[in-house]
From Swiss-Prot:
<feature type="binding site">
    <location>
        <position position="583"/>
    </location>
    <ligand>
        <name>Zn(2+) 6</name>
    </ligand>
</feature>
<feature type="binding site">
    <location>
        <position position="580"/>
    </location>
    <ligand>
        <name>Zn(2+) 6</name>
    </ligand>
</feature>
<feature type="zinc finger region" description="C2H2-type 5">
    <location>
        <begin position="436"/>
        <end position="459"/>
    </location>
</feature>
<dbReference type="Pfam" id="PF00651">
    <property type="entry name" value="BTB"/>
</dbReference>
<feature type="zinc finger region" description="C2H2-type 1">
    <location>
        <begin position="291"/>
        <end position="313"/>
    </location>
</feature>
<feature type="zinc finger region" description="C2H2-type 8">
    <location>
        <begin position="521"/>
        <end position="544"/>
    </location>
</feature>
<dbReference type="GO" id="GO:0010833">
    <property type="term" value="P:telomere maintenance via telomere lengthening"/>
</dbReference>
<feature type="binding site">
    <location>
        <position position="568"/>
    </location>
    <ligand>
        <name>Zn(2+) 5</name>
    </ligand>
</feature>
<dbReference type="GO" id="GO:0005654">
    <property type="term" value="C:nucleoplasm"/>
</dbReference>
<feature type="cross-link" description="Glycyl lysine isopeptide (Lys-Gly) (interchain with G-Cter in SUMO2)">
    <location>
        <position position="263"/>
    </location>
</feature>
<dbReference type="GO" id="GO:0045893">
    <property type="term" value="P:positive regulation of DNA-templated transcription"/>
</dbReference>
<feature type="zinc finger region" description="C2H2-type 7">
    <location>
        <begin position="493"/>
        <end position="515"/>
    </location>
</feature>
<feature type="region of interest" description="Disordered">
    <location>
        <begin position="159"/>
        <end position="205"/>
    </location>
</feature>
<dbReference type="InterPro" id="IPR036236">
    <property type="entry name" value="Znf_C2H2_sf"/>
</dbReference>
<dbReference type="Pfam" id="PF00096">
    <property type="entry name" value="zf-C2H2"/>
</dbReference>
<keyword id="KW-0804">Transcription</keyword>
<feature type="cross-link" description="Glycyl lysine isopeptide (Lys-Gly) (interchain with G-Cter in SUMO2)">
    <location>
        <position position="143"/>
    </location>
</feature>
């Protein structure tokens, strides 16, 4: 053992425990029934599979645990840091329950091997004075395999976790059920369980006085429905994940837990044999048939958990707090929120220490304090910018100073600001999933924001944000702000390597590929790769596709790529934002304007000849959509009249139903004046 210190690991754990007791370097906050515990995420993740799955990457945060764990959670936390678990006959059941639901296998093993002072015979005799001991019913006839029946009943009663508990374990507070479950059929089993159960005390005794362990994460279906006097006992730990989500092997091997029906009474409820016998045979005997999410193909034990999971795809939060208006995916999350004294928090006020002014929110007080101090809490270390929130400072450091984004994709190494953006990127880019589906037309979007934009633009025709310079309308204000930069010349995104600035983050990302040499877009027909998607589409259209299949339905010009057609149609909409300062000639692309300016430099008094149909502007939005459709989809109507008339070269006499600008005239069939405007009426039954 040269060069090693045997007690090093013990000393490190002791120091961590001292830090926990002093609250030093603790990055985890655990709220258990109003009691707050500080701990280290690394220690929690090492000892509990629950915490490891909840925050697998070790990021900080706070977790709210069931109030029923308040009395014994301190014992488990001490066990995490010291390895010692203070068990007694009084707290053994609660510690075992918490250890199972938090998935602490070492604590579960200690609880199962714990020997209480009260014998099993005395405990069984105190609970019921009737019937023979459960161990005597070994030779009874069996209708199903004993091990499977034992697993179902024990798991439903909260005695065994999903992976079957060792048979030697028992609880001093409850009747022993293992051999009973092995030897009896479902109907006779329920009868003996009723005999072994503790009888109900008088009705004036409160339910809180009974030894009924609380179920912190009960499913919504476990609540009373329509005044019924029965409910389903669902014993299941449900974290922030997808409830009863099962992996592929587990979906095959796991059996459905028994649907034991319980009747409410003032004490420990007894099992109802009649209700159990009335169940369908497939629920009592058959194996569980997992239900699958049609969007992401995850599997669940029940339709309820699938219903809750689907809300993540739709964004629905049906459970709203009546006091503060906060919404949740699941009802149990709302109940936990209400249990944390929502009303008391909403009535809390924050007072300024300087002028004694009161505020309802802490953020409002922070904003107010800036008027006294003149300084915001978060300052940029590279420039003089200040921010009220940490996330704003983080975004500023990434956009302007080249700080790395915290969440990297393990497949392509692309980084994101939030974990949600990373998950959506992996689903869309690497698995080809578009998880958000429009209920009206079936359109699929890769993000919830994209789906909302689709609904507003296509089904609601909502474009409330209008540009004050060119009257172009947008569905979102962020898109308008991005568009305004084309008029103001603002370029807030700067490359931290060469200092070049850009209008959008996407443009900066494309530019960064010139430094890194990355070419993420590859051609499926050859080995050529590209830095952008547009050049890839043009390459495929020009090199690997024959003919020019895409043509404009207004002027008849043909194109190889549909992107080229879309750019061309903008000319018919009048979108020419690059204007020559010498002659006023306008272009759709800046490269065309630069090429035109070179002609002015070489030729004096250059006056470009107006090309036919160059400035034909269609005011009707539907006509632009018609222009992008293939000819087979067009119906006989004014749109075809326009195309035919343009081909013949005489517009005024052929379009009696159209409106021509009064100031325009034709000098000949080969030349068209610059500002001919057509407002077309598309038939209502045209599918646009």
């Amino acid at each position: 053992m040269d060069g090693s210190f045997v007690q090093h690991s013990v000393r490190v754990l002791q120091e961590l425990n001292k830090q926990r007791e002093k609250g030093q370097y603790c990055d985890a906050t655990l709220d258990v029934g109003g009691l707050v515990f500080k701990a280290h995420w690394s220690v929690l993740a090492c000892c509990s599979h629950f915490f490891q799955s909840l925050y697998g990457d070790g990021s900080g945060g706070s977790v709210v645990l069931p109030a029923g764990f308040a009395e014994i959670f301190g014992l488990l936390l001490d066990f995490f840091y010291t390895g010692h678990l203070a068990l007694t006959s009084g707290n053994r059941d609660q510690v075992l329950l918490a250890a199972r639901e938090l998935r602490v296998p070492e604590a579960v093993e200690l609880c199962q091997s714990f020997k209480p002072k009260i014998s099993v015979g005395q405990a069984a005799g105190g609970q019921s004075g009737q019937g023979p001991p459960a161990s005597q019913n070994v030779n009874s006839h069996v209708k199903e395999p004993a091990g499977l029946e034992e697993e179902e009943v024990s798991r439903t009663l909260g005695l065994v976790p999903r992976d079957q508990e060792p048979r030697g374990s028992h609880s001093p507070q409850r009747p022993k059920l293992h051999s009973l479950a092995q030897s009896e059929s479902p109907s006779s089993l329920c009868g003996k369980l009723k005999q072994a159960s503790k009888p109900c005390p008088p009705e004036d005794k409160k339910l809180e006085d009974c030894k009924v362990l609380p179920r912190p994460f009960e499913a919504e279906g476990a609540q009373l429905q329509g005044g019924s006097n029965e409910w389903e006992v669902v014993v299941q730990v449900e974290d922030d994940g997808d409830g009863d989500y099962m992996s592929e092997p587990e979906a095959v091997l796991t059996r459905r837990k028994s649907n034991v029906i319980r009747k409410p009474c003032a004490a420990e409820p007894a099992l109802n044999a009649g209700s159990l016998a009335a169940e369908p045979a497939e629920n009592r005997k058959g194996t569980a048939v997992p239900v699958e999410c049609p969007t992401c193909h995850k599997k669940f034990l029940s339709k309820y958990y699938l219903k809750v999971h689907n809300r993540k795809h739709t964004g629905e939060k049906p459970f709203e707090c009546p006091k503060c208006g906060k919404c949740y995916f699941r009802k149990e999350n709302l109940l936990e929120h209400e249990a944390r004294n929502c009303m008391n928090r909403s009535e809390q006020v924050f007072t300024c220490s300087v002028c004694q002014e009161t505020f309802r929110r802490r953020m409002e007080l922070r904003v107010h304090m800036v008027s006294h101090t003149g300084e915001m809490p978060y300052k940029c270390s590279s420039c003089s910018q200040q921010f009220m929130q940490k996330k704003d400072l983080q975004s500023h450091m990434i956009k302007l100073h080249g700080a790395p984004k915290p969440h990297a994709c393990p497949t392509c190494a692309k980084c994101f600001l939030s974990r949600t953006e990373l998950q959506l990127h992996e689903a869309f880019k690497h698995r080809g999933e578009k998880l958000f589906v429009c209920e009206e037309c079936g359109h699929r979007a890769s993000s919830r924001n994209g789906l909302q934009m689709h609904i507003k633009a296509k089904h609601r025709n909502e474009r409330p944000h209008v540009c004050e310079f060119c009257s172009h309308a947008f569905t979102q204000k962020a898109n308008l702000n991005m568009h305004l930069r084309t008029h103001t010349g603002e370029k807030p995104f700067q490359c931290h390597l060469c200092g070049k600035t850009f209008r959008t983050q996407a443009s900066l990302d494309k530019h960064n590929r010139t430094h890194t040499g990355e070419r993420p877009f590859s051609c499926e027909f050859c080995e050529q790769r590209f830095t952008e998607k547009g050049p890839l589409l043009r390459h495929v259209a020009s090199r690997h596709q024959e003919g020019r299949p895409h043509f404009c339905q207004i002027c008849g010009k043909t194109f190889k790529a549909v992107e080229q057609l879309r750019v061309h149609v903008r000319r018919h909409k009048g979108v020419r934002k690059f204007e020559c300062t010498e002659c006023g000639y306008k272009f759709t692309r800046q490269a065309h304007l630069r090429r035109h300016m070179e002609i002015h430099d070489r030729v004096e008094n250059y006056n470009p000849r107006q090309r036919k149909l160059r400035n034909l502007i269609i005011e009707d939005e539907k006509m632009v959509v018609v222009a992008l459709q293939p000819p087979a989809e067009l119906e006989v109507g004014s749109a075809e009249v326009i195309v035919e008339s343009l081909a013949q070269g005489g517009l005024a006499s052929q379009l009696p139903g159209q409106r021509l600008c009064a100031e325009e005239s034709f000098t000949g069939p080969g030349v068209l004046e610059p500002s001919l405007i057509i407002t077309a009426a598309v038939p209502e039954d045209c599918d646009t």
